[in-house]
Curated annotation (Swiss-Prot):
Domain of life: Bacteria
Gene: fluC
Family: Belongs to the fluoride channel Fluc/FEX (TC 1.A.43) family.
Catalytic reaction list: fluoride(in) = fluoride(out)
Residues at which Na(+) binds: 76, 79
Membrane topology: Multi-pass membrane protein
InterPro entries assigned to the protein according to its UniProt record, in alphabetical order: FluC (IPR003691)
This protein's GO CC annotations: plasma membrane
UniProt source species: Campylobacter hominis (strain ATCC BAA-381 / DSM 21671 / CCUG 45161 / LMG 19568 / NCTC 13146 / CH001A)
Biological role: Fluoride-specific ion channel. Important for reducing fluoride concentration in the cell, thus reducing its toxicity.
Major subcellular location class: membrane
UniProt xrefs under Pfam families: CRCB
Keywords, ordered alphabetically: Cell inner membrane, Cell membrane, Ion channel, Ion transport, Membrane, Metal-binding, Sodium, Transmembrane, Transmembrane helix, Transport
Subcellular location: Cell inner membrane
Protein's name in the database: Fluoride-specific ion channel FluC
Length: 126
């Protein structure tokens, strides 16, 4: 059990750093007011990877600790529902209704599409 916890924690450490670097890099190229797009991007990337990995796991034996490292740890820290929720609350609070609906719509639709693409890619590979 301790080793599994260590794997999840290490994955979370890596995922949190990747998310920070992604946001930092995004902020260097775009205005801070568009930082919500970085949240959409990390959630899309995470959706693809989780769809891919968990579909592969239905056919191939993936090490339990590696799966926990990747899915629970890394993807859990990389993707974020709390930031998504906060950004939408800020949009509503500032009366930015179009950004609110755009963010919700893009996040849900694109994340579903990329999750299915991950599943489909995994099926093609095996």
């Amino acid at each position: 059990m301790f080793y599994t916890i260590l794997c999840v924690g290490t994955g979370g450490f890596v995922g949190a750093i990747l998310r920070f670097l992604f946001y930092f890099g995004f902020a260097q190229f775009f205005s801070q007011k568009y930082i919500f797009i970085a949240t959409i991007c990390v959630n899309i990337i995470g959706s693809f990877i989780i769809g891919f990995v968990l579909n592969i796991a239905t056919t191939y034996a993936i090490n339990y600790n590696f799966k926990n490292f990747l899915v629970t740890g890394l993807l859990g820290a990389l993707t974020t529902f709390s930031t998504f929720t906060y950004e939408n609350a800020v949009f509503l609070n500032h009366g930015e209704i179009s950004k609110f609906f755009l963010n919700i719509t893009m996040s849900i639709i694109l994340c579903l599409i990329f999750c299915f693409l991950g599943i489909y890619t995994a099926k093609i590979i095996h």
